[in-house]
C-alpha cells in the first residue's frame, strides 16, 4: 500500500490537483531508488498534479537511472508538473542538478 499525502484536494471542473507528496520509503520499502523501473513505479499516478514532492527521508542512495527518469525524462514529458525533492542529501541534490534536474 502506497502512502500518499495530498496537500490540497481536487478542485472542481477537472483541474489539476495542487500537490502530491510521495514518500519513497513507503513506495520502495526494501530498496533504494536506483532503476528507471523504480522511477516509473513512483510516478505512476503523478499526472493530474501541479507539483510532485518526493520525500527522500531514510534514503541513502539514488541511482542515475532513477534520477534521470524522474528529473529529466518525466519533466520533459510533463513540463506542467514540478518535481521537488524533499529531505534529499547534499550528494543527491548535486546529482539531480548535474544530471539534468531542472526543477528543484
Language model features with spans:
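Amphipathic alpha-helical interaction surfaces in cytosolic regulatory modules
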Residues: 26-103
Amino acid at each position: 500500500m502506497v502512502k500518499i499525502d495530498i496537500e490540497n484536494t481536487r478542485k472542481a471542473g477537472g483541474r489539476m490537483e495542487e500537490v502530491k507528496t510521495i514518500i519513497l520509503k513507503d513506495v520502495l520499502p526494501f530498496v533504494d531508488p536506483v532503476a528507471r523501473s523504480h522511477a516509473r513505479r513512483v510516478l505512476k499516478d503523478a499526472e493530474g498534479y501541479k507539483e510532485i514532492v518526493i520525500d527522500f527521508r531514510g534514503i541513502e542512495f539514488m541511482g542515475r537511472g532513477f534520477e534521470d527518469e524522474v528529473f529529466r525524462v518525466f519533466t520533459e514529458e510533463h513540463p506542467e508538473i514540478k518535481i521537488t525533492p524533499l529531505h534529499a542529501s547534499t550528494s543527491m541534490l548535486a546529482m539531480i542538478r548535474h544530471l539534468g534536474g531542472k526543477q528543484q
